[in-house]
Design a protein with these regions (language model features):
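A detector for small-residue-rich transmembrane helices and their helix-helix packing motifs
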Residues: 2-208
């Protein structure tokens, strides 16, 4: 009986993380397909596939902000991002639910790409950006916001998880070619979105 309960609990945990699992699968599939069709370390190839490159993105190819979120330059790049996505994504998805979690992830990633574009345009740097790290930093911001402002414990974020989120963020950002502007943009977006979600839900509960 106890083993059955454990297995059922494990299945429930995975079902509660279905969006995180889907995002990981999507990133891995994109990586495999692009690796088979060309050289993912080649910036020109990655631009052709949809990487974020500000001269093109800010000229109207805004779809690159989305496609670049699922592209990676190496297996190490993919692996470090997916480990962090699983670790932090499960926390945020359990707290916010599938819809709000996906909204937080996507808006953080899009914001990260946009901030990266404007920053590199200002400094006139021809940087090709790709990867899930901007969105993942958004999850770090979300965890921080919920840990700080959810005083009633409505979303069940354990404040002891914040250092772990910071640690995974550091692991994501240790690569020499890290896009700091994107990470800052994603972090700020995730923090703000979760803060707004918390405030709206708290306000609605108070009015009722």
């Amino acid at each position: 009986m106890s083993n059955k309960l454990i297995h059922e609990s494990d299945r429930a945990d995975w079902r509660a993380s279905i969006v995180t699992i889907a995002l990981v699968i999507a990133n891995v599939l994109v990586f495999v397909v692009q690796s088979l069709k060309g050289d993912i370390a080649d910036s020109n190839y990655m631009i052709a596939c949809g990487a974020d490159y500000w001269p093109l993105t800010l000229s109207g190819e805004y779809w690159r902000l989305f496609t670049s979120m699922f592209m990676h330059f190496s297996l190490q790049h993919l692996a470090s991002n997916m480990i962090s996505l699983i670790a932090m994504g499960m926390i945020v998805e359990h707290a916010l639910g599938h819809g709000k979690y996906l909204l937080t992830y996507l808006v953080s990633g899009l914001t990260a790409g946009l901030v990266s574009c404007f920053y590199h345009r200002v400094v006139q740097a021809a940087v090709v950006s790709a990867g899930a790290s901007g969105a993942i930093f958004g999850l770090t911001g979300a965890i921080a916001a919920l840990a700080i402002f959810d005083r009633a414990g409505q979303y069940g974020i354990d404040k002891r998880r914040v250092p772990m989120a910071v640690l995974f963020s550091v692991l994501v950002g240790i690569e020499s070619s890290v896009d700091t502007a994107a990470h800052i943009g994603g972090l700020a977006a995730g923090f703000l979105i979760s803060f707004l979600i918390l405030k709206i839900s708290t306000s609605g509960r108070t009015e009722n």
